[in-house]
């Protein structure tokens, strides 16, 4: 029976609605707990928030969540004083500081939720196929409120699976990283995926944003 290597679940956040972010972390944690594989995963809330009110609320909410779930030592919170290079820099800082402990990381968005069973499946895929560097899921939009969001959510439900199948066909063994809802092999990502600044002025030069 294959047991997945240790996996980090990382939530990079930036001045978000604190209660909503931590509720998604809570739901994800509890869903993973139900799989019986929680011991193979550790959670990180990686804050780049610039408002002192926000990051103090984040710290208080993190401590409260850990007490509720008895998750000290399994859910970690880090606030970065200088949010250099935005989200990409946030993830890079995690990889340099803590990445050596983990074989894989699942990168979430602040508004992401993923079922625990899906996380376990992703980790097992990486374990079974050591040449895979990244597995990108196909996220679905839920809970949209605005007209544009509702239209986007409908189109996502109506033909999202067909779009993903077509994308997989044309990409073959390669793949695009959308920046979230993906599992990544940490060592390979750290060694080969650092991107340089482009020469010239923005928007065609400077930092690579996406």
Each language-model region and where it sits:
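Internal catalytic domains of large membrane-associated glycosyltransferases
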Residues: 1-210
């Amino acid at each position: 029976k294959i047991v997945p290597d240790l996996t980090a679940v990382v939530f990079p956040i930036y001045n978000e609605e604190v209660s909503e972010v931590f509720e998604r972390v809570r739901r994800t944690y509890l869903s993973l707990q139900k799989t019986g594989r929680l011991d193979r995963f550790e959670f990180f809330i990686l804050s780049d928030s610039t408002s002192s009110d926000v990051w103090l609320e984040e710290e208080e909410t993190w401590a409260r969540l850990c007490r509720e779930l008895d998750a000290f030592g399994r859910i970690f919170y880090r606030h970065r004083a200088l949010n250099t290079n935005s989200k990409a820099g946030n993830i890079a800082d995690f990889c340099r500081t803590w990445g050596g402990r983990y074989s894989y990381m699942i990168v979430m968005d602040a508004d992401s939720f993923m079922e625990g069973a899906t996380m376990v499946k992703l980790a097992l895929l990486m374990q079974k196929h050591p040449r895979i560097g990244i597995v990108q899921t196909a996220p679905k939009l839920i809970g949209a409120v605005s007209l544009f969001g509702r239209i986007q959510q409908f189109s996502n439900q109506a033909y999202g699976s067909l779009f993903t199948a077509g994308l997989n066909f044309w990409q073959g063994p390669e793949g695009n990283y959308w920046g979230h809802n993906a599992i990544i092999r940490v060592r390979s990502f750290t060694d080969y995926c650092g991107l340089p600044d482009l020469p010239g002025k923005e928007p065609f030069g400077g930092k690579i944003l996406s």
